[in-house]
């Protein structure tokens, strides 16, 4: 054994000596050079690397020059962003002059991100939309979701609030297809499920929307409502580059109701009273005093909108990006700040102590590092976070607006002349003194803190077979939110409608002062992700392009505090899935694609926990046919697409619906009439639904992609049809005789909705002299209908929601005004909501029962969600100077509430 070891040692030393001798025989030289553009200007930070030698490379200096030591007959690769790379063989020349040519980008070579990674747009067989990041960057909104409006085909959005920090739009991909628990899309940032609201636009490299089943099936149940893929910026091999940006915008109120002034209001009140044969409220001398502002305490004339609201408010945005790195280590670091000022006017004295306005501040940071561990191993490490502070008035913005809309201009002054605060005679929630509600009730603060970490390992496995690659991902996120409410109320007075003998006001105190109180709380969650993917891409005989992906994923989300004794919600929410994709194309002419997702969910009982969801797509690029290429050279791409797929949704409104829940019931009375004894016991608070399973969506998509006239004109249009069945809902048709109230009834898969529509976009590019002009537009239309819903018994067919859109608005039909008392007496009874007098609105008795009530409400208008969204823009570039304009709008929506 000893001899064997000695022999192996001697052989190793001989091999080492031979290798060292061979290496010494290779001549190493120093190569210097300069890298220039086509105008002979130096390119700073160009990359010069030795081919097939990881980590060996340099970067050009401020003069575009470089030096590097290489062996003879090695190759140098010279690259620079926006230019074509060059490969140079080193023979005996030691000084190089490299002239770089600008890369000729092509729409056909455009790369999009899909569920399985990067691929050329020409090879996409499903419905995928991309956002132009440059257009999002010029949006005045500090919120990414708001910036999407009218910029991305297939995305419908609606902003329901303008309050700072609470003004994020809701968005849906291709509209609403369910009335179940979840309608929002899956958002993935660098492959990890994240919230899109608080991402800095400055950090985004690419933004894609996956809309049909063939693109989302690989995500299983998570992709039922569409998928958004966001890729953040990464570093490039270059010297350190620092970029900073600061901007400000002035935001005005969109639509503010205009109210009449005090004298007009008083005159109309008198007119209404006289019409009803009643005494007028205001006498002529009081109208004179009111008109001339002679007694602002007893006869005020207050423009509440002007007293409470500013004309506009500022938004400030700033960002700082640092990027750079070497050939084997690259980094991107960013920080950003957004501040949205509030629209309310404030009490200057109180403002010295604390902030009562509605405003928001947000800080974002991000670090992405890419490390080439070996020639075939890439490690990506990402850390990002967000800190947000939202401030609001003590009563909250909604109650401030209720007060603004409900208070009359003549009821009370803003503040009495002696400094007393006027009390309102009405319900404080609706007709409180707006100045008190907005400035004198304390403040509310909410702090949100997010920390997101992720690691991705990309390992090429070409040593097994060419084109094989492994990708592993792990992410760990923490989210915490804390609030503090400091509330108070001032002493409030009412001035009597007379003065004392000395002419002083006589006051009556209606509300005692409430000292400031404090309440606080918080919530949080922890989210873990893991994914493992195996990719294979290969080209056979130059024409057969084959690709496949196998993916395993699991995630777990748990609330970290504020659980109390809530046992159900203390259990982590978990998902698990296995999915795959197979793709094939021949000569970029014919394409087929098959996907599947096998997903598990804890929301269903054993036997229903896993679902299989397949999808396929095909495409034909007619422009690649020889006849077209020979006779219609102006036709660059003419691709028709079709896809079909089935996807599942497990987002239900309750946890573990297949389990019974038992709770206590107190003071239950039973036995004969008049028996007053009560008992405590147990009862079902929810009944198990053992048979429930996945909400299923079957989706069809037909698409057309056109690129014409040497890529000057491009058009994409899709028609989609989706039928959602098995929607999870409570069994409304069960009668009360079964012993269950509405909140206790079991759930079942009994709902159905169909959603149809189209989306598309086009662009036109033209160079006119030194001016580069681009015209673009996009539009999305969707229309849904409820086919089945377990609503229970309705007295009249038109009261059912079935047959109408999800969230259809309903109301009474107005026929005009009551002319006189005879008109009232000869019309159906209409006193359900109060007494009726001449001049009031007359409503239609739809069911003909002689009474106007809730049974006469019918579908009116549309839903409050827009069914049609469009956007258009023009941009021009002249010698590096850019100018652009963007218009956006919505249609087929009704913004009212009855």
List each model region and its residues.
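Cleavable N-terminal targeting peptides that direct proteins into the secretory/outer-membrane pathway or into
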Residues: 1-30, 71, 84
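Extracellular/periplasmic, surface-exposed regions of secreted and cell-surface proteins
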Residues: 136, 184, 316, 368-377, ...
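Short, acidic Ser/Thr/Gly-rich low-complexity loop/linker segments typical of extracellular
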Residues: 54-65
